[in-house]
Amino acid sequence: MVHENLNGRVAVITGGGGVLCSGFAKDLAAQGVKVAILDLREDAAKKVADEINAAGGTALEVGCNVLESESLEAAREKINAELGSCDILINGAGGNS
């Protein structure tokens, strides 16, 4: 099901390189949402962003430690500059360690 009212919105997904949140990211991108994939493991975030972009979506990977305010501020600045301000937040960081 396509939700046209999501088209062009910006979603920020922490923990976006993981299994569950990467699924959220891909589903939102399929709805036309521009997705910022935040993850402590930037390589994992890049893999998800590359998959979304290759499928015709818009995604940006951002290496970010959600426990550090400086890291969050840098992420916010990058996202705002490249995608726009956040409309949707999915806070999935936390891991299974």
Question: Which residue ranges define each predicted feature?
Answer:
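Generic hydrophobic, amphipathic alpha-helix propensity
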Residues: 20, 45-48, 52
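Structural signature of beta-strand start/N-cap positions in the alpha/beta core
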Residues: 10, 34-36, 58-60, 85-87
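Canonical Rossmann dinucleotide-binding motif of NAD(H)/NADP(H)-dependent dehydrogenases/reductases
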Residues: 4-36
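Conserved glycine-rich Rossmann-like NAD(P)H-binding loop of the short-chain dehydrogenase/reductase
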Residues: 31-47
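Conserved amphipathic alpha-helix within the SDR
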Residues: 49, 53, 59-63, 68-86
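Amphipathic, non-transmembrane alpha-helical secondary structure
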Residues: 22, 26, 30, 46, ...
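Conserved NAD(P)H cofactor-binding loop of Rossmann-fold oxidoreductase domains
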Residues: 92-97
